[in-house]
Amino acid sequence: MRLRICGDGCELLIIFLISSFLSVIYLIVTAYRTFPDFGLELIHLLAVIIVEAIVFWNGIIRVYCTSMQLGIKWRFIGIFCGWLPLVNLFALMKIIRVASWETNFESEKIAVNKNRANSQICRTKYPILFVHGVFFRDYKYLNYWGRIPKELIMNGAVIFYGNHQSAASVIDSGKELAERVRQIVGETGCGKLNIIAHSKGGLDSRYAVSQLGIENYIASLTTVNTPHYGCQFADYLLSKVPESTRNFIAQKYNSALKKFGDSNPDFLAAVNDLTASSCKQLNDTVLDIPGVFYQSVGSKLNVASSGRFPLNFSYPLVKYFDGENDGLVSTSSSGWGENRIKLTVKGSRGISHGDLIDLNRENIEGFDVREFYVQLVKGLKESGF
């Protein structure tokens, strides 16, 4: 229903553009023929304005109310530029292009999922456990993984979440995850789990599997944009920011997150464990477990401006210290395991740290994040996991 309304709105806006162009030509011709008597011409002009206004507002309201991809940015640009002659036409054409592409893209996805519904290509032998990264939580109504879990479930996946705190040391987060794994296996009798972990969650998961006795409950561990070798820029920042400032920020964060459900958040411990020096120590002791399949997914932005705030600001800093990156984690640091996947798209866009968890619910030309995870999980199924 939403896509149909959005598509109808785009069609009305296209009709508006074409009919407006033809109406201008018509009014010019009739004005020339009726000169100097403009009485009839005024009637024609009023009729055109009324009809075009009806078509335009009918279309733009439908698009504004149903498009998910326009976002605040293009809605604001559309409103602001609506009062600027000629510029408003370019803005309107951009709005039509974005909304039309969304309609076509989502309609094709619906058709694909419908055709393969009976195949259950994501029905893995063992359920999926999603593990979030630092400074986020698993909220019921605001999914950390965006539209990805719903897409996987439609294709047969059984999904659980880590439900651990937003910020803690790798050791403490690992303990929470180990407890969660035992809980899921004990309650469901599923035997094992396939972990998919993002960012610091990958370090937490590696520690839990290697050090906390849950290796027999884990079939595979897929890390996504995880800084396995740390972030050198984090070492630099921690060395430059005064201790008083670090403690002030940590106190404010810890206090705020307790109100959101964290029992014992530790901002500084979480940040310290992301440094290159800490990750080196981790890698010396946290070894891969034979019998557990390890793989990684990494991505990179192509230019800083293609990342959403704050990744567009952090990208140059990370690039200076660590090389090509996703806005936070370098591609060299994200690789781990038997299968190392590196992602980007052509042009200036690239794929950011947030894009790989569908943080902004944005459709990216050349990369379908939901389908990527469908194929990733399908691969786990085909491997017997």
Where do the model's predicted regions map?
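Hydrophobic/aromatic beta-strand patches that form the interior of the parallel beta-sheet core
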Residues: L129, F160, S220-T222, Q295-V297, ...
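Catalytic metal-binding/acid-base residues of hydrolase active sites
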Residues: V134, Q165, P227, G298-K300, ...
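Active-site catalytic motif of lipid deacylating hydrolases and related acyltransferases
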Residues: Q120-K192
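Short aromatic-enriched loop/helix-cap "lid" or pocket-rim segments at secondary-structure transitions
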Residues: L142-N143, C231-L237, S305-P310
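Flexible, membrane-associating and regulatory peripheral segments of lipid-active enzymes
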Residues: M1-Y141, F385
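C-terminal catalytic-base region of ester-bond hydrolases, centering on the histidine
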Residues: E41-L46, W74-F80, D288-F385
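Glycine-rich, phosphate-binding/catalytic loops in enzymes
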Residues: W145-I148, Q211-I214, L238-V241, F313, ...
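Serine-dependent carboxylesterase/thioesterase catalytic core
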Residues: H132, I159, K175-L282, D326
